[in-house]
Amino acid sequence: MIHVYNTLSREKEAFHAITPGKVNMYVCGPTVYNYIHIGNARSAIAFDVIRRYLEYSGYVVNYVSNFTDVDDKIIQRAREEGVDEMTIADKYAQAFDEDTIPLNIKPATTRSRATAVIPDIIAFVEDLIHKGYAYESAGDVYFRAKKFKGYGILAHQDLAEMEANAAGRLDDQELTRKEDPIDFAVWKASHSSDEISWVSPWGKGRPGWHIECSVMAQKYLADTIDIHGGGIDLAFPHHTNEIAQSEARTGQTFVNYWLHNGFVNVNDEKMSKSLGNFTTVHDMLAHYDDPMVIRYLLATTQYRRPINYAPDTLEQARAELERIRTAYRNVFFRISTAKTGHDDSVDYAIAEHISHFREAMDDDFNTQNAIASIFELVTIANNYASRDEIKLDTATRLTHAIADLMNVFGVNGLSEHLTLSAEAQALLDKRVQARAVRDFNLSDQLRDQLSDMGIIVEDTTQGQRWHHA
């Protein structure tokens, strides 16, 4: 059984889906005013791995995520560039897709923009006002935080401390408009004619950030959902406010399991755009030749733990991934000459390590322990490939096991590294023939020719092997 760490309870809990065999999952997406950085990608990949493992375990996952495409940061960026807000939002929403496709992040079942649900947001706010949880003030609409019992419990925030901190951040006008400093905006009045806005019962304005996710989760999933994910920095105030407004409206539990991923750190500081210590995925993909190495690094650290990012961590990830690819390749090349049948002891070891992988992933998606099981399969693969004789069923089972488990991490393409052009394949075949008649001069010439094409050839006791440089 899968157990997950629920931020709300601060405990690992057995996972029980609301509907057996199906999971409703919402994950906060980016505010589209810039290219995503590695920290943003870490969150997207962490929950992509969780989704993949749930699917591997037999669940059908309805995965919803969003683009926040109306926000102060987007408005500011639009003013700086002299364009309208939707031009900025469209540009960086498209960039998100372009950056996440090479990282093999599965498309959401539904990816909604906040601006696509404005009527739903207005109806949601009207319900909150009707129930006494929200009030209009000078065109803004605020949520009465203290009216909601348990406000702040997700992030273990103390009300008095929150009130003091909020009061210190607000100017006199904001303090005058609010009944209480910790009340938060669910609708913001428009204060400029050149600012994006919509007509509402309270005048022209736009939604507050927090209400957007509440509306989309309920619209595309349900009033109560199984899993809500996001970075740990979203626990307060974003997810705290989502809980308050969602449960105030429906009277039902909003989310059964709250999951939060850890930061990506640079020199022990959180990577963020505000600190200016970020590296965009866009830049990394432009300068790094293998996106799966980036994916591997971000996928194989347990999702709640921080990642210290540095160039040498990428090189370590590259080396580890190459070990896996090499082991896969070693067995793959033996399949064509393998004997019919299977080896019971190796089959048993394969099944044992698949079971260990599942045990690790069942324990709050512990990818660090799960990858250790894959490296046990790597050892088995290398040892098996070095035998004088191997069996077809076992060799096939071994390559499938490695590929299937790596696919849970979203690190695919093991077999893609074994594809060749027709020209390269012809040279390899010619080299086999040359060695068969002991024409080693021609064999060496062909090896050099293949090397110039980026293909490294090795001669082993089991025959010729190759890999891309």
From Swiss-Prot:
Residues binding ATP: 273
Give any Pfam family that matches.
tRNA-synt_1e
Cofactor(s) for this UniProt protein: Zn(2+)
Kindly state the positions of the motif 'KMSKS' region in this protein. 270-274
Report motif location: 'HIGH' region.
30-40
Q: Name one GO molecular function term.
A: zinc ion binding
Q: Where in the cell is it found?
A: Cytoplasm
> Is Transferase tagged as a keyword?
no
Cofactor binding summary note: Binds 1 zinc ion per subunit.
The catalytic activity, as recorded, is: tRNA(Cys) + L-cysteine + ATP = L-cysteinyl-tRNA(Cys) + AMP + diphosphate
Enzyme's top EC category: ligase
> Primary place of residence?
cytoplasm
Instruction: Summarize where Zn(2+) binds, as residue positions.
Output: 28, 213, 238, 242
Q: Which UniProt keywords apply?
A: Aminoacyl-tRNA synthetase, ATP-binding, Cytoplasm, Ligase, Metal-binding, Nucleotide-binding, Protein biosynthesis, Zinc
Name the domain of life this protein comes from: Bacteria
Question: Might you report a single GO cellular component term?
Answer: cytosol
What EC number(s) has UniProt assigned to this enzyme?
6.1.1.16
InterPro entries the record matches: Cys-tRNA-ligase, Cys-tRNA-synt_Ia_DALR, Cys-tRNA/MSH_ligase, CysS_C, Rossmann-like_a/b/a_fold, tRNA-synt_1_cat_dom, tRNAsynth_Ia_anticodon-bd
A single GO BP annotation from the record?
A: cysteinyl-tRNA aminoacylation
Q: Which family does it belong to?
A: Belongs to the class-I aminoacyl-tRNA synthetase family.
Q: How does it assemble?
A: Monomer.
The name on file for this protein is: Cysteine--tRNA ligase
Organism, per UniProt?
A: Leuconostoc citreum (strain KM20)
